[in-house]
Amino acid sequence: MARIGSFLILLSLTYALTLCICDNASNFGGNKRNLFPDFYRSSCPRAEEIVRSVVAKAFERETRMAASLMRLHFHDCFVQGCDGSLLLDTSGSIVTEKNSNPNSRSARGFEVVDEIKAALENECPNTVSCADALTLAARDSSVLTGGPSWTVPLGRRDSATASRAKPNKDLPEPDNLFDTIFLRFSNEGLNLTDLVALSGSHTIGFSRCTSFRQRLYNQSGSGSPDTTLEKSYAAILRQRCPRSGGDQNLSELDINSAGRFDNSYFKNLIENMGLLNSDQVLFSSNEQSRELVKKYAEDQEEFFEQFAESMIKMGKISPLTGSSGEIRKKCRKINNS
C-alpha cells in the first residue's frame, strides 16, 4: 500500500505543476468544442482522482499495463472516434472490435477499464463516460512511467455501435510502409508531427513476435531478412522470435528502457533498432519525419511537449457530445441490452 500511496502522491504533484496545454488544431467530425477540462466539476468532482487511483493500483500489479491502456485509447480513437466502441463485447447487434486483426490477442487492459468504471459508478452513477475514463487512463499511464502530463478535455459520450471491419482499414499495421501509415493518420486529422510524436509512445510496452517476424526472415515477401536492421539487435530478436512458432513471444518496443517513458525510442531508430517496420520507416523513408526523429532524440523535453499536444489532439477525434451517444453503465455493453 505504501508504494501505491507514493504513486498517487507523485501523480498529484505532477498534475499540480502541469501547465494547461491547449490544442486548436482541427479534427474531422464530432463537436470537440463541447469538450473542456472542468466538464465534471459539479457532477463528479472526484472523477480524475478516482481514475488515477485505479490506474496506479493496476500499474503496481503490472507495469506493462500502462502501455496497454495507452494503446487501447489509440485504437479506440482511430475507429469511429474516441467513443469507447473498442470496449464493447459482442452482444445483440454489436459485433466487437476486439476480434479485428489489430486487436485480436493483443488488445488488453479491459479489466482495468471495468474497475475504473465500477469505481466511477459507485461515486457518480450515470455520469462519467467510458470514453472519458479511457482518455484519462491513457494520460495517467504516461505519468506513471515518467512521461508528460496534460490537461484532458472531457465531455465525451459513449457510442452504441462498434465495427469489427473498421479497425482493419483504419489502424496502422506493424508492417505498413510510411505512406500507408501517414495516410491513416491524415484520415483522422493528424499531421506528420503528430504521427512521429505519438509513435514515441512505443518507448514503453511490448510487441508480439508475429508483428515483427517478417523483418527477421521475410521482409516485404523477399524471403530474406531486413538488411537495415542492426545486426546484433536482429540476432537478439531471432532468439526470441523463431521462423515458425512462438507467435505470442514478446519483445520490448524499446529494448533500452521498455518500462520508462523517455526519448530512447527515437535514439533507437537512428541506430536502426526500431522493432517494428512501422517504427523504423519514420527514420528511413521520409526526410521530414527523419528530422523530427533526430529532434526528439536530441531533446526529450520537446518530445514530451509535442506528445502531450498530439495526445490532446488525438483525444478530440470525432467525439460524441451533447445528446449523442450515451453514458454506459458498464463499458462492455450498451445500456438496455
UniProtKB/Swiss-Prot annotation:
Glycans are attached at residues 24, 191, 218, 249. One of its GO terms (biological process) is hydrogen peroxide catabolic process. Ca(2+) 1 binds at residues 76, 79, 81, 83, 85. Its cofactor is heme b; Ca(2+). Keywords: Calcium, Disulfide bond, Glycoprotein, Heme, Hydrogen peroxide, Iron, Metal-binding, Oxidoreductase, Peroxidase, Secreted, Signal. Its main location: secreted. Residues 1-22 form the signal peptide. InterPro entries: Haem_peroxidase, Haem_peroxidase_sf, Peroxidase_pln, Peroxidases_AS, Peroxidases_heam-ligand_BS, Secretory_peroxidase. GO terms for molecular function: heme binding; lactoperoxidase activity; metal ion binding. It is found in: Secreted. GO terms for cellular component: extracellular region. The active site is at residue 75. It is an enzyme of class 1 (oxidoreductase). Binds 1 heme b (iron(II)-protoporphyrin IX) group per subunit. The keyword Metal-binding applies. Disulfide bonds join 44-124, 77-82, 130-331, 209-241. CDD domains: secretory_peroxidase. The record marks 71 as: Transition state stabilizer. It comes from the Eukaryota. The keyword Calcium applies. Heme b binds at residue 202. Belongs to the peroxidase family. Classical plant (class III) peroxidase subfamily. PANTHER family: PEROXIDASE 14-RELATED, PEROXIDASE 72-RELATED. This is Peroxidase 14. It comes from Arabidopsis thaliana. The gene is PER14.
